From Swiss-Prot:
It comes from Bifidobacterium animalis subsp. lactis (strain AD011). It catalyses: XTP + H2O = XMP + diphosphate + H(+); dITP + H2O = dIMP + diphosphate + H(+); ITP + H2O = IMP + diphosphate + H(+). GO terms for molecular function: dITP diphosphatase activity; ITP diphosphatase activity; metal ion binding; nucleotide binding; ribonucleoside triphosphate phosphatase activity; XTP diphosphatase activity. Homodimer. Binds 1 Mg(2+) ion per subunit. This is dITP/XTP pyrophosphatase. One of its GO terms (cellular component) is cytosol. Keywords: Hydrolase, Magnesium, Metal-binding, Nucleotide metabolism, Nucleotide-binding. It is an enzyme of class 3 (hydrolase). Substrate binds at residues 7-12, 75, 182-185, 214, 219-220. Its EC number is 3.6.1.66.
Length: 239
């Protein structure tokens, strides 16, 4: 069973493989994951206004181009006192896409005067699985158009779609701590802490956790685990 993951980040494949191993055991070896990046596929333009819409857009885009089942996710940070911003703009909150330091600096400045008890936030992830039920014969020859992955599903006669959510609630701290992870991890302290952290009084930001500790509680991990029943159905039925 081949499944394309709509990402250019090979690290996501590792995380999904780990979760597949949890779910399927030795059967995970029957599932071959390949990234959109390794196939030379472009990223679609993310025109959705929700995480769910963008995850589905990306999965549809890849499924359309390959004729294969596709997994995609979209995630970001929601700060309650900011009216759920930065939300889908999380990666480019300061203007430049992926400038983590600038995004953190701007966010901290915007809530500088907010009391600690009111700095609640959560990471949210939407994960989507799109399974083509029937595809055009020449699907591999379609020209990649990053702008229309959401609009019409050209190349898919029909498809089964599943979208799920995962969240990691927490608090925005006042200064960055830790060097692991990426994005807003250095200023986000999850409510759920590793064993022993609360007892010791040394609460950790996401960036102070090991990858294993973070993946066990992360929004993406929760969303991907919620997607596993749909993937199991795909593996067992082949459709």
């Amino acid at each position: 069973m081949n499944i394309v993951v709509a990402t250019h980040n090979e690290g996501k494949l590792v995380e999904i493989r780990d979760i597949l191993a949890e779910e399927f055991g030795d059967g995970a070896h029957d599932i071959e994951l390949v990234s959109a990046g390794s196939l030379g596929l472009p990223d679609p333009v993310e025109t959705g206004i929700t995480f769910e819409a963008n995850a589905l857009l990306k999965a549809r885009f890849v499924a359309r181009l390959t004729g294969l089942p596709a997994i995609a996710d979209d995630s970001g940070l929601i700060v309650d006192v900011m009216g759920n911003a930065p939300g889908i703009l999380s990666a480019r909150w300061a203007g430049e896409h992926g400038n983590d330091a600038a995004n953190i600096d701007l966010l901290l400045a915007q809530i500088e005067d907010i009391p600690d008890d009111d700095r609640t936030a959560r990471f949210r992830c939407a994960a989507a699985l799109v399974v083509p039920i029937a595809a055009e014969e020449d699907v591999a020859d379609f020209e990649a158009d990053p702008s229309d992955g959401m609009d019409d599903g050209d190349g898919l006669v029909d498809a089964r779609e599943t979208v799920v959510l995962g969240e990691m609630p927490g608090t925005i701290v006042r200064h960055p701590h830790g060097s692991n992870g990426f994005g807003y991890d250095p200023i986000f302290m999850p409510d759920e802490q590793p064993a022993g952290a609360e007892e010791s009084g040394e609460l950790l930001t996401s960036a102070e956790m090991t990858p294993e500790q973070k993946n066990a509680i992360s929004h993406r991990g929760k969303a991907l685990r919620a997607l596993m029943p749909a993937i199991r159905e795909l593996v067992e039925t082949g459709e």
